Amino acid sequence: MLKTGSWILSIWCAINGLLALIILGYVIVLRQDSPILQVAGFSPAEIAALSARTLGALNAFTLLYNSCSLAVSILTWPLIRRELVAGDQRAFWILVVVIGWIEVMAFWASAYVGHGRWQGNVLQSALYLAGIGLCASALFSPNGRRQARTTG
């Protein structure tokens, strides 16, 4: 169960990192405005009516958030693939706090834009809960600990 849970968490990392990288490329390389405007349902006319400072602030926050999101994905990947899969309970609790916080904040932030990307939030949260749940079962249940020692 520990290996399966860690693979599911690795999928969470890959999706999270890939989305962040795509958005960073969209804003930096393609020089487009933050995709949050489309997610929030702004029409092209509404976007055109926004001031340059407002668009600049949205783009800055988009770059900052997605840079951090990409960094979290890169930093949690080895934590999952090495420490967690080896049965390290500290790695488990770090991932509970870090990824759990991100998932809660994703839903909270989504509320500000009418839950425009709720499907992505649900998918990411389902992956997180399934992965962390399987890992918890393997690390903290008596049968799981025994299995982790013999197969880990």
What are these regions (language model features)?
Residues 1-32:
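Cytosolic juxtamembrane helix and N-cap/initiation of the first transmembrane helix
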Residues 6-16, 66, 92, 96-99, ...:
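Residues within membrane-spanning alpha-helices of integral membrane proteins
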Residues 16-19, 99-108:
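Aromatic-anchored segments of alpha-helical transmembrane domains
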Residues 73-92:
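Juxtamembrane helix-break-helix junctions at the cytosolic face
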Residues 104-125:
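Membrane-helix boundary connector in multi-pass membrane proteins
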Residues 129-150:
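Membrane-water interface at the C-terminal end of transmembrane alpha helices
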